Amino acid sequence: MELDDFDPEDKEILSWDINDVKLPQNVKTTDWFQEWPDSYVKHIYSSDDRNAQRHLSSWAMRNTNNHNSRILKKSCLGVVVCSRDCSTEEGRKIYLRPAICDKARQKQQRKSCPNCNGPLKLIPCRGHGGFPVTNFWRHDGRFIFFQSKGEHDHPRPETKLEAEARRAMKKVHMASASNSLRMKGRPAAKALPAEIPSQGSLPLTWSFQEGVQLPGTYSTPLIANAPQQNSLNDCLSFPKSYDLGGSTELEDPTSTLDSMKFYERCKFSSSRIYGSEEQFQPPVPGTYGDYEDLQTWNKNVALGRNPSDDIYYPAYPLPVASWPYDYFPSQNSLEHLPQQVPSEPPAAQPGCHPLWSNPGGEPYEEKVSVDLSSYVPSLTYHPPQQDPFLLTYGSPTQQQHALPGKSNRWDFDEEMACMGLDHFNNEMLLNFCSLR
């Protein structure tokens, strides 16, 4: 059927050329997009076609210069094949997509075949009179006009999606191969039996609720400014053994000591409770009943004498400073107390270092060698918020304490093992001592 048999409108649609000044606009139907256009063909696509907007083609095409700015010109690059003409396991030939850049395409030809590691070669396109097949794209009005000149004389290369999938699979294979080679190069790791961590390898944490095991030769200065949680816990209860893997159980204070030693140790612990603010201040006359002996002791320290060389050391409880009320034992608590406390309290055995700092010297100056190999702090009690380091034992006017008599130095390791008292018993016993 010749062109003379068509209507003038149909003739215009069929006889247009991409280089015409005016292209037909009375197009009733548009063509479906063609992925592999070949030979001398022409297509009219809708301007809404996304593939036509992208000028997509499965042939390896690159943009070329054109004197007409309204027309996009693309030339075919051909196909890259294996020089050995190898095939994959599925029976397909190796037809790679050529790189668009000239340098990248030259570098691609020096690579080996991904299937047989043979050399690659480029088959150029010469389907348009010895020149590459050319595709033309032109946007005009509501349509996109496409025209191809020439016939491809080479096999179809892989599409862009196939090329991307092949590169991804190649990267995965290379990564797995390198990992396998790395694992083969390493010596086989011997499976070690599970080791139970020893006591020395475990972290040693300082806590108020659990015991801490220190070396027997540990020596540290006694810091007067104790933490607030430890202000009411001067009586410590020590376990016979300490195990990091098990629970620590405290001994019953009344099961190992009689009532006389029990009273004696509680009296010693009461003399070690003092305030953090008053430890740096000199005593005031009238506060203590034995102020003159305290002055004599302070003078000896100022003259350079070591307080540890004296025969005895006074243990003075601090005065009631800023608590708004006093602690007095109840009648019910006093009814059961005479059954445990003897009628004549024995004299406290001196020999420990006083915790009262030297007024003329630096704080925390005196040091005491303490064996803390099995110390376990007792339960903590939170004192009032005003002065957490002051504890009252009754009215200041009623306190009368006698100086301890001369005696041999008591065993520090034994006497430091004070019993852990709860808040009620500690308060009850210390108030009873002040009333007597």
UniProtKB/Swiss-Prot annotation:
Changing residue 113 to A: Loss of transcription activation. Zn(2+) 2 binds at residues 82, 86, 113, 116. Placenta specific. Residues 14-169 bind DNA. One of its GO terms (molecular function) is DNA-binding transcription activator activity, RNA polymerase II-specific. The keyword DNA-binding applies. Changing residue 76 to A: Loss of transcription activation. Polyubiquitinated in the presence of UBE2D2 and FBXW2 (in vitro). GO terms for cellular component: nucleus; transcription regulator complex. It is found in: Nucleus. Keywords: Developmental protein, DNA-binding, Metal-binding, Nucleus, Transcription, Transcription regulation, Ubl conjugation, Zinc. Zn(2+) 1 binds at residues 76, 125, 152, 154. Transcription factor that is necessary for placental development. Involved in the control of expression of placental growth factor (PGF) and other placenta-specific genes. Binds to the trophoblast-specific element 2 (TSE2) of the aromatase gene enhancer. Binds to the SYDE1 promoter. Has a central role in mediating the differentiation of trophoblast cells along both the villous and extravillous pathways in placental development. This is Chorion-specific transcription factor GCMa. It comes from Mus musculus (Mouse).
